[in-house]
Every structure is written in C-alpha cells, then in structure tokens.
Amino acid sequence: MADKGSGGSRLPLALPPASQGCSSGGSGSSAGGSGNPRPPRNLQGLLQMAITAGSQEPDPPPEPMSEERRQWLQEAMSAAFRGQREEVEQMKNCLRVLSQATPAMAGEAELATDQQEREGALELLADLCENMDNAADFCQLSGMHLLVGRYLEAGAAGLRWRAAQLIGTCSQNVAAIQEQVLGLGALRKLLRLLDRDSCDTVRVKALFAISCLVREQEAGLLQFLRLDGFSVLMRAMQQQVQKLKVKSAFLLQNLLVGHPEHKGTLCSMGMVQQLVALVRTEHSPFHEHVLGALCSLVTDFPQGVRECREPELGLEELLRHRCQLLQQREEYQEELEFCEKLLQTCFSSPTDDSMDR
C-alpha cells in the first residue's frame, strides 16, 4: 500500500509541458511566478488546480494526451488520494487520544501532560477540518459525538473552547454536518456555555459555533428560538468582553436581516428598549452593530418604529446628539449612517398614525 514515509505523499513538482503550455502570466499562485503548479494536498486541491489550469487556456484544440502527461496525472491523483488517507489516519490518531479515559490517581504533572495532549489533538483536528472532506470524514468517525458528549462540558476551559471551535469549523456552510450537530443536542450546550461559562474564550468560541449552526440554517434557527437564544444573545451583549459584545450584536443584526419574520418576537421581548439602553453606555465601536441591529428591527416594521418613538426612551435626542459626536470622524461613518437612517425612519414622518394602518 502507500508509503508512510514523509516522501511517500509528494507529487511531481511540475506538469510536463503540453504542445501549448499555460502562460506564466497567469494568476501567480505558484511560488515566484514560475508557472509550476503547487502540489495539491488532497482531492479538493487537485480539483482546484485542474479548474485553474483549464481556465487559463480557453477552448484549446482537442488533441490526444501524451504518455508523459498521462503518467503525471496518474501520479498526481495517486498522491492526492494518499494524502487524503494520511490525513484520515491523523484524525484517527487524534480521536484515539481524545477517547482515552483520564488517568486515574494521576499526579498533577501527569494530568497537565494529559490535558496538553488532548488540546494538541483538538488543535490538529481543527486545522485538518478546515478542509470540508476531512470535516465529513471526522463526523463519519464519530468525532462529533465525542466532542458534544464529552468535551463541551470538560473540566478544563482549554478543552471546552477548543471543542466549541472545532464544532464551528466543521459546521461552517455544510448542511449535513450542521444537522448532525443539531441532532446531538449541541446547540443547548453551546448556549449554556455562552451564557454561563466563567472563561471568556470559551464564551467567544461557543458564540462562533452557534453562529455556524443558525445562520443560513432553518432547523438551527428554530432550535435557537425554542431555546430562547435571543435572550442569551442579549445578555452576551451586556457583558464587559468587547469581542463578545461585538460578535453578539453582529449575529443579531445578521439574523434580523435574514429572518425579518422574527421581529415581532424580538419586540415582544423588549429588544428595542434593551438595544437603546446599550447605545446609552459609554461610546465604543460596538455601538455600530447595536445601531445596525436597531435599524434592521425598524425597517419595514411599524411596531418597531412605534416602540422607538416612545417618549420615555428619549431615542430621538440620543440619536441627534450621537450624530453631532460622530461628524467629521471617518472611522465612525457607518455608525453615523445608522443614526441618520433611524432618525429618518422613526422621526421624520409627519404623523404617527400613518404607520399604524
């Protein structure tokens, strides 16, 4: 079978020239602009290389493949398959480390070494699973069951946040993996981490995984609603961790834009009042995303506009003062635009009754 040595997976360094080779003035993806294709690490890379090579030479005249080119292609495909198999073996080794029981009666040094090995395995898996083929193989190897069942609730924060990060990495834009993760009950655990974990890094990584499970994923969003995810998101925006606040507000804004049908639910939760309260806090770049979410909440939604007009909120005065603060400050132009849009939407109408009917 395949050579397991480090040289066994190497591809031929250059594609033998055809009668009319690709121009060296192409995309510049090869090192130094030499025109030699970079060896693909797996089938996905091989496919991308073939697409790129084909796009550089439109409509070439059909001609038989030379024996030299045929041999190169066979070697490239063999190496790509071998590289994929080797990465699967790496994942299996990582899962063996993660599946082991914690050493019984171990001393402090031994426990620290054990944790480092597990963290290293999770980090390697996160790197490998950036590739969608590897992410699918990881799930087929029952890796996701292990993450959700054991590592999201591990005692060490370093294991919890790495598990959450790996779940997000695998789930990004892959519906089949998202469905498996949701079926394992991961979203409930991730929301609990976001809401209650004592480690800020765990909370940030949990939010990343949640975002990967609910954006562009209807089943995930429905679970998110049933688990009162919007309340968890609002509490995250009220924390003192800047990264957590910004990412929570950004996710809220994204969900409002993509799913306007849930605006009524959010208004009934008092979201308008809570967002305005956040805007009243000491000014920070985070406010851009809060005002963006508020804009999304009132756009084409009269109930949101009416709530923004409530006199006790004092929103109009707040927005006008903020506009004055942000004038001539280039770095806050998006926030300024949100303020102006809110003023136009909520406070420029000649009559309040016109929006009620």
Curated annotation (Swiss-Prot):
InterPro entries: ARM-like, ARM-type_fold, Hsp70_NEF-Inhibitors, Nucleotide_exch_fac_Fes1
Positions of region (Disordered): 1-68
UniProt-recorded Gene Ontology molecular function terms: molecular sequestering activity; ubiquitin protein ligase binding
Any one annotated GO CC term: extracellular space
Any one Pfam family match given in the protein's UniProt record, by short name: Fes1
Keyword Secreted: no
Entry-annotated residues carrying Phosphoserine: 349, 354
Claim: Transmembrane is one of the keywords in the record: no
UniProt superkingdom: Eukaryota
Repeat region (ARM), residues: 130-172, 175-215, 218-257, 260-299
One biological process term in Gene Ontology: positive regulation of protein ubiquitination
Keyword annotations from UniProtKB, A to Z: Phosphoprotein, Repeat
Gly residues: compositionally biased ranges: 23-35
Function: Inhibits HSPA1A chaperone activity by changing the conformation of the ATP-binding domain of HSPA1A and interfering with ATP binding. Interferes with ubiquitination mediated by STUB1 and inhibits chaperone-assisted degradation of target proteins.
Record's subunit section: Interacts with the ATP-binding domain of HSPA1A. Detected in a ternary complex containing STUB1, HSPA1A and HSPBP1. Interacts with PGLYRP1; this interaction blocks the cytotoxic activity of the PGLYRP1-HSPA1A complex.
Protein name: Hsp70-binding protein 1
